């Protein structure tokens, strides 16, 4: 879809590329945010927002957008939809079992091949977690919105400050639930 806002979009890349150049490009986006910075800076400069609200930014965008907003003095609110910030493979599951090993040491994603049961994918997930770590993300983000108290508690367990975690539950109207 072509629209006026295209000039702000991140460069499109394939995360399922088979060739070496494509794989390097995808890894560079995931670990360093390559292909995002210039256009997002332009967006911040031209739009001058008071707040940036982030959702599902890993891979296609990158946590670099939180850093860029922070550097310009723009407040950053980040709604969480998974456990990516404390578990490099997103789910707190390892081979079907609950796992919290990465809360304190991200190397477990590699040792257990948690990402797609693949050593290379797990190394990439580890690199991403090491670069976009809780110290940086907590500094750049004013508030993380958690859809449940459980998630907020897990985020705290993973080292995120309670003062930055807000619980706003997802819900539907009671009249929409059939018992």
Regions found by a protein language model. Give the residues of each.
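A conserved catalytic-core segment of Leloir-type glycosyltransferases
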Residues: 1-51, 92
């Amino acid at each position: 879809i072509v629209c006026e806002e295209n000039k702000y979009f991140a460069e499109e890349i394939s995360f399922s590329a088979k060739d070496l150049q494509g794989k390097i490009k995808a890894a560079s986006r995931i670990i360093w945010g390559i292909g995002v910075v210039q256009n997002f800076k332009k967006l911040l400069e031209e739009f001058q927002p008071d707040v940036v609200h982030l959702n599902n930014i890993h891979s296609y965008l990158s946590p670099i957008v939180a850093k860029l907003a922070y550097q310009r003095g723009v407040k950053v609110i980040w709604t969480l939809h998974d456990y990516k910030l404390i578990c490099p493979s997103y789910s707190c599951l390892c081979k079907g079992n609950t796992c919290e090993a990465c809360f304190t040491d991200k190397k477990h994603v590699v040792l257990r091949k948690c990402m797609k049961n693949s050593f290379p994918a797990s190394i990439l997930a580890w690199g991403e977690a090491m670069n976009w770590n809780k110290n940086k993300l907590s500094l750049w983000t004013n508030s993380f919105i958690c859809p449940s108290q459980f998630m907020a508690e897990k985020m705290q367990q993973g080292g995120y400050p309670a003062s930055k975690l807000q619980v706003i539950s997802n819900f539907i109207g009671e009249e929409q639930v059939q018992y």
